[in-house]
Each structure stands twice: as C-alpha cells, then as structure tokens.
Amino acid sequence: MAPKKKVAGLIKLQIQAGQANPAPPVGPALGQHGVNIMEFCKAYNAATESQRGNVIPVEITVYEDRSFTFALKTPPAAKLLLKAAGVQKGSGEPHKTKVAKVTWDQVREIAETKKADLNANDIDAAAKIIAGTARSMGITVE
C-alpha cells in the first residue's frame, strides 16, 4: 500500500448538483488550499450530473501535495422536505404559522434517502429526525 498522504485541510460545501463553477463560494474555499479549482469542478459536475436540481453537500479532503478527494453526501433534509411539501421556503414562525403538510409516508421516504448520513439505527428513528426537522420548518406531519 502507498504511504499515507498528510491531510492539509477539510472543506465542506453545499453546491447545486452539476453546477459547480470557480465563482464564489467554490473558488475562494478551494483556492486558499491551493487546489486546482477547475479539476474539482469538472469532477463534481460529472459525479452529480444525475441529481440536477438538488443541492448536494460535498466534503473535500485536501492533501499537502495539493491533491484532493471528495465524498458526496445526501441532499439536506430541509431541501427534501420543501420539495415534498411543494413550497419555496419554511415558515418564519414555525410554531405559529404552518406552511404545508407532508404525510408519514413522505417522511419515511426522505428518511430512506438520508439514512446513510443520519445518526439513526433504523428507519423509524431516522423518520423521527426528519419529522423534527419538518416541525422546526413549520411543516405539519400527518
């Protein structure tokens, strides 16, 4: 096995799938670590092409020799909930004003999608986490 490379930094970004470009926030975040920005943009866009329309979080590990690897995460629960509810944004005052309703089936479906990134042992626990996110956005779960 090759000797381990020394990690120089870890960058976390949320970028639209298939739309990474050198403009902020991507350019400055990668530039300060000396990463080839266009190389990352091409690799990210190729990896997320099938998920266009979603925001895909990415964790970029930068090594001392300026090479990098990246891991894609699942879209944020809030974005998935907004899409399921069919609204643009959550409530300004979530416990007073409710903006939409989602069913438990929709919540379970989102939990299935997010399971890899959630700190839950089973789908029921994951669904409760998603339901809590919905509640804090002013979305009612039925």
From Swiss-Prot:
Q: Which Pfam families match?
A: Ribosomal_L11, Ribosomal_L11_N
The gene is rplK
MF terms in GO? large ribosomal subunit rRNA binding; structural constituent of ribosome
Q: Which species is this UniProt entry from?
A: Mycolicibacterium smegmatis (strain ATCC 700084 / mc(2)155) (Mycobacterium smegmatis)
- Give the matching PROSITE patterns: RIBOSOMAL_L11 (PS00359)
Q: Name one GO biological process term.
A: translation
Task: State the family named in the UniProt similarity comment for this chain.
Answer: Belongs to the universal ribosomal protein uL11 family.
Keyword Ribonucleoprotein assigned to the entry: answer is yes
How does it get modified after it is made?
One or more lysine residues are methylated.
What is the name attached to this protein's record?
Large ribosomal subunit protein uL11
| InterPro entries linked to this entry | Ribosomal_uL11, Ribosomal_uL11_bac-typ, Ribosomal_uL11_C, Ribosomal_uL11_C_sf, Ribosomal_uL11_CS, Ribosomal_uL11_N, Ribosomal_uL11_N_sf
- UniProt-listed SUPFAM superfamilies: Ribosomal L11/L12e N-terminal domain, Ribosomal protein L11, C-terminal domain
Its function, per the record, reads: Forms part of the ribosomal stalk which helps the ribosome interact with GTP-bound translation factors.
Task: Tell me where the signal peptide lies.
Answer: none
Q: Which UniProt keywords apply?
A: Isopeptide bond, Methylation, Ribonucleoprotein, Ribosomal protein, RNA-binding, rRNA-binding, Ubl conjugation
Q: Coiled-coil regions in this chain?
A: none
